[in-house]
Swiss-Prot record:
GO terms for molecular function: rRNA (pseudouridine-N3-)-methyltransferase activity. Specifically methylates the pseudouridine at position 1915 (m3Psi1915) in 23S rRNA. The lineage of its organism: Bacteria, Pseudomonadati, Pseudomonadota, Gammaproteobacteria, Moraxellales. InterPro entries: Alpha/beta_knot_MTases (IPR029028), RlmH-like (IPR003742), tRNA_m1G_MTases_N (IPR029026). GO terms for cellular component: cytoplasm. It is found in: Cytoplasm. Homodimer. It holds the Pfam family SPOUT_MTase. Belongs to the RNA methyltransferase RlmH family. CDD domains: RlmH-like. HAMAP family: 23SrRNA_methyltr_H. Keywords: Cytoplasm, Methyltransferase, rRNA processing, S-adenosyl-L-methionine, Transferase. The gene is rlmH. This is Ribosomal RNA large subunit methyltransferase H.
Length: 159
């Protein structure tokens, strides 16, 4: 199994890079993980709803074009299914047993396009809270690492 994180946005603040890199390095012994940073559509100051929809469509096309044919697409969005860490660990164990490669899509500041939502095998919510997409990167990689540590009896998860 391989995990690819398809994320909109290429210039992250230093605190995001620091937090993400820590867990990204930790997860590698458990599962091959890759991050694909895709360009965010250029936004204006007073964008209309039509403009925002267009930006989401452009970003959605980037996500779908980056998707490999054998990958299961999972859309991260506030309206998705919530999982406990233990349920995520079970889900990841199943992916590994089935040999599934997984692509996790993180949208830009305006979310994911309808095309990405429709293409996704399922939708996952890290929280009912709305979060900035740079923070989602850190939360996602930490939860993936935590789930893998459960599956490998590593002492990181102590809940």
């Amino acid at each position: 199994m391989k995990i690819r994180i398809l994320t909109i946005g290429q210039k992250m603040p230093a605190w995001v890079l620091t937090g993400f890199e820590d867990y990204f390095k930790r997860i590698q012994p458990f599962v091959q993980t890759q991050v694909i940073e895709l360009p965010m559509a250029k936004r204006g100051k007073n964008d209309s709803e039509a403009d925002i929809l267009k930006y989401c469509q452009i970003e959605g096309e980037s996500i779908l074009n980056a998707l490999k044919p054998n990958e299961t697409l999972i859309a991260l969005e506030v309206g998705g299914r919530e999982l406990s860490t233990e349920k995520l660990a079970d889900t990841m164990k199943q992916w590994m047993l089935e040999g599934n490669d997984v692509a996790l899509a993180i949208g830009g500041p305006d979310g994911l396009s309808d095309q990405v939502r429709k293409a996704a095998a399922w939708h996952w919510s890290l929280s009912k809270l709305t979060m900035p997409h740079p923070l989602v990167r850190i939360l996602l990689i930490e939860q993936l690492y935590r789930a893998m540590s459960i599956n490998h009896n590593h002492p990181y998860h102590r809940a």
